[in-house]
Regions:
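General beta-strand structural signal in soluble alpha/beta enzymes
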Residues: 10, 70-73, 99-100, 131-134, ...
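Charged helix-capping and loop-helix junction motifs
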Residues: 55-56, 87, 112-119
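Structural preference for alpha-helix termini/caps and helix-kink/transition segments
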Residues: 270-357
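Catalytic-core regions built around general acid/base machinery
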Residues: 90-94, 115-128
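Portal/gating segments that form or line small-molecule/metal binding sites
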Residues: 44-100, 107
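Catalytic nucleophile loop
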Residues: 99-102, 125-145
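Glycine/threonine-rich flexible loop motifs
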Residues: 105-115, 186-189
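C-terminal and late-domain segments of enzyme folds
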Residues: 2-33, 39, 44-55, 59, ...
Length: 357
């Protein structure tokens, strides 16, 4: 694992706009080819048009950046610690670039905070890999997550959701506020990511946090390797602490210590180790093995020798599960094999297989 942190880009909005293509390109060009890029779809997982959003983002990377970004899907809390969840974890662990973007900040934080997604994102940055978080996903990166929909649309009294505190790795104690300069409200204040200055002031009174505001169509790029940060795009980055408000203009690169000094760490630090007791049970470990084998089959099915070895491992695992009368997971393996065009035939003490004609 690298001793240097990776580069993280935080976008206030406009993740697929022409204005910020260069930000994606900058992070991708730092990575040796072939780039293993994955999109995490959690923030918009609840939306009816989730599939269309996935296609839009994949088309953007394909057409604008000549990169095939693959999907690491986790859209519902009911998927937590299932085979599909562990498959997503395995994909993200292999990634050297992760993208997450639009949707609901609070929905994303509920899916990510205090489970293995959080640990995986921390490890991703720690190993020197790069990530780009935009809009809703960006809001989760600090100590708190701003529940925009609940406050602005529903009218719930201002409150904080828990954040990932991923920026704590860079020595920054803050809450991230994208859409900082939003003016869509016209005759009412929609700055501070739509909630407005008055409601943000109430939030600060309830539970104080330094603020890291990022204007729309603007990116903050933090380099762990260079120990610098850069502002890019149409707007600026605003830092608010107990003493002052500072503005960092687009087109400038600064020493990271400048940001660290103005967003100094609070006394309430996030635990470095996340409680992962739930993932240690036998069922979860079996699902994890199945997920990893499924990924390997998908990636290596053109290689006949490796393909046969992987199928044999799945067959052996299925036989073991049948002997333990764990028919539900045994049938799950059968479904995986059959979806890969493999026919299996059960007998009392063995399982045979062949590729369907």
């Amino acid at each position: 694992m690298s001793n240097q942190l990776g580069t993280i880009a935080i976008l206030g909005s406009g993740e697929t706009s022409p204005n910020l293509v260069a930000v994606h390109r900058k992070l991708l060009q730092e990575i040796p080819k072939p780039v293993k890029a994955y999109m995490l779809d959690s923030p918009f997982g609840f939306q009816e048009n989730a599939e269309q959003l996935v296609e839009k983002i994949q088309d953007f990377y394909d057409l604008s950046l000549n990169i095939k970004i693959k999907l690491a899907s986790y859209r519902n809390i009911e998927e937590l610690n299932t085979k599909s969840f562990f498959k997503t974890i395995s994909l993200l662990e292999k990634a050297d670039f992760i993208f997450a973007g639009p949707g609901s900040p609070s929905y994303a934080s509920k899916l990510w905070v205090n489970n293995e997604i959080e640990e995986t994102l921390f490890n991703h940055i720690k190993k020197g890999a790069n990530a780009l978080f935009a809009s809703a996903a960006a809001t989760t990166l600090g100590e708190n997550t701003l529940p925009v929909y609940e406050i602005y649309k529903v009218g719930i009294d201002p409150y904080w959701e828990e954040g990932l505190d991923l920026l704590g790795l860079y020595g920054l104690s803050c809450t991230v506020v994208p859409h900082f300069n939003n003016r869509e409200g016209g005759n009412h204040d929609t700055s501070f990511s739509y909630v407005g200055k008055n409601r943000m002031s109430k939030l600060m009174e309830i539970n104080y946090s330094n603020l890291l505001g990022i204007d729309e169509h603007t990116a903050l790029i933090i380099s762990g390797k260079e120990n610098t940060f850069e502002v890019y795009g149409l707007g600026q980055v605003t830092v608010i602490n107990e003493d002052k408000t500072l503005e960092f203009k687009s087109g400038e690169t600064y020493d990271l210590t400048t940001l660290q000094n103005h967003l100094s760490k609070s006394h309430k630090d996030k635990p470095s180790e996340i409680n992962q007791e739930a993932k240690q049970n036998k069922s979860d470990e079996t699902l994890r093995k199945i997920a990893n084998l499924e990924i390997q089959i998908e990636e290596n099915e053109s290689n006949n020798k490796i393909f046969k070895e992987l199928v044999t491992q799945l067959i052996d695992l299925r036989l073991k599960l049948r002997s333990e009368k764990n028919y539900e997971m045994s049938d799950m393996i059968r479904d995986i094999l059959e979806s890969s065009n493999i026919q299996i035939e059960d007998s009392t003490d063995k399982i045979e297989w062949k590729i369907k004609d």
